[in-house]
Amino acid sequence: KSRYDENYSYEILANLDKYSIYDVMQIKHFNEDYTDTSTSYIEIKTRDISIYEYDDCVIDSYKIHNLQKLSKATNNRCFLCVIYKGDKKIALWEINPRKQYQPITKLANWHTANLADGKKQKEMVALPLKEAKIYSYQN
């Protein structure tokens, strides 16, 4: 879906599978010159587990690195947002473009049209929940 107004195109790319409802929300400036925008960029993920089950949130490392590159290139703030549906909680991390996020290797669920459902070794980053801002929401 896209919504156009005078200056911006808002693109919400939905990955409607059991692992993630809203995969990416990307706000893109019309002329693709990001240097003078004051827009923040956010990656939105959903989790079916409880926010209290783990003390961190594991995300693909390339998603973190992409947010870091975008933040450096645009001089804008970038965020990772994780929606914990069952608890009605939102965890929000600001991704620091200068921080060295430590990757870990994890056997993770893999779901794609090109590969059978199953497990795959993936490079991930574990973001501590204590570093996130936590919000409650209502439907």
Give, region by region, the residue ranges found by the protein language model.
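Mg2+/Mn2+-dependent nuclease catalytic core
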Residues: 47-70
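Short His-Asn-centered micro-motif
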Residues: 14-15, 44-45, 81-84
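Short polar/acidic secondary-structure junctions
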Residues: 16, 29-33, 72
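Short beta-strand or tight-loop elements
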Residues: 20-22
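Nucleic-acid nuclease catalytic cores
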Residues: 68-99
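Conserved catalytic cores of phosphodiester-cleaving nucleases, focusing on short active-site segments
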Residues: 24-50
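Acidic-basic catalytic patches of nuclease active cores, encompassing PD-(D/E)XK
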Residues: 1-18
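Intrinsically disordered, low-complexity terminal regions enriched in charged/polar residues
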Residues: 90-139
